[in-house]
Curated annotation (Swiss-Prot):
It comes from Bacillus pumilus (strain SAFR-032). CDD domains: RecA-like_HslU. Belongs to the ClpX chaperone family. HslU subfamily. Residues 158-174 have a biased composition (Acidic residues). The gene is clpY. It is found in: Cytoplasm. InterPro entries: AAA+_ATPase, ATP-dep_Clp_protease_ClpX, ATPase_AAA_core, Clp_ATPase_C, HslU, P-loop_NTPase. GO terms for cellular component: HslUV protease complex. It comes from the Bacteria. This is ATP-dependent protease ATPase subunit ClpY. ATPase subunit of a proteasome-like degradation complex; this subunit has chaperone activity. One of its GO terms (molecular function) is ATP binding. It holds the Pfam family AAA_2.
Amino acid sequence: MEKKPFTPREIVEKLDQYIIGQLDAKKAVAVALRNRYRRSLLHDKLKDEVVPKNILMIGPTGVGKTEIARRIAKISGAPFIKVEATKFTEVGYVGRDVESMVRDLVETAIRIVKEDKMKDVQEEAEKQANKRLVHLLVPGKKKSQSVKNPFEMLFGGSDEDDRDRDQSSEEVELESTRKRIAHQLAMGELEDHYVTIEVEEQQPSMFDMLQGSGMEQMGMNMQDALGNLMPKKKKRRKLTVREARKALTAEEASKLIDMDEVSQEAVYKAEQQGIIFIDEIDKIAKSGGASSADVSREGVQRDILPIVEGSTVMTKYGAVKTDHVLFVAAGAFHMAKPSDLIPELQGRFPIRVELDKLSIEDFVKILTEPDNALLKQYKALLETEGISLEFSDDAIHKIAEVAYHVNQETDNIGARRLHTILEKLLEELSFEAPDITLGTVTITPQYVEEKLGKIANNKDLSQFIL
């Protein structure tokens, strides 16, 4: 597990830095994460019996369901993927099969483990890259092999000794030059010099075209079988020493890490720490009367069921068991209820959390409190144009009121409404910013009313503009 396991309270405090409210949901995922650490301390026999308690989040869009799961993955360093339930089709139909979510999870784990391994060999890789740079900056002369005549081979010749002496002195001089260049490289004096290196050509292969077509598994097997028969093309590129060092370091690091070991660790990490977030799960629930669409939706549920229950999925890195993967499902459940899911799938999500709708006070906090708060982002963006943007407390409250009012009158899209409203509010200022010198601009309630009042109060206009 992570080097320093966080307590549930610490996890909630970390989530509070980015997400406002929703304490019940934060507590549920914090306990689920802590239980993974607790399970890792059990003896092997009992460890296999303890399975994660999957979570079902119920709440309107834009209240923080996805963000909670994403932040949890970052806190724990666990492999995390987000999938939409609506993207999958049941077996036998065109579209993505549900097993692809497990393959995507393993790919994410591979990337995480590979990055960690590359950091471990970074120092050695940079040494090797610098050696290659020295040889690129001071290339050696190719040895000329002259054809000897038979008499010279029999009786020897003085020219050969002279040639050896010349070559020896050239090698000494070359070595001396390379040492000088290596010193200059270390001092950073040659960063803007250009060198020509060979790099692998990045072109989409025919196998990439199979992605998303439901044929990933077939494409994967074909690539494994034919990969060695089709070597990657290389092309020559002229780069600065600074850029070339990055490319060569990455290449050398790849040589130093053992991909078999990476695959083994990644599969273990995906199995034991993986988190799969299934969004829009309410869209595959039955919606009242039976129809052919409902039959198809139920088919997707039945395909998801064995993955959530615990099964073995074949990937190009080996077999992956999903018994201990944590599944977090989420949905608004406007048209359907959680009880509209098939009973077997309902039973696999024992922890249910209802997320609250956002109030005016929540909107005020979202605008100001998180580390990545929207107002901080807009201030930083306009500061690049030399404009210091300030918002009065009353103006912030007015923006929150407008967001809440529009959500109530039209579709409730939660905190995402703030993006639309702030864009409209600052549209003119953002457009004129490069051409004017204003110094400090303070947004007041009157300015908010002037820019948004008419639109917010007109239901027809707000549906189209906000």
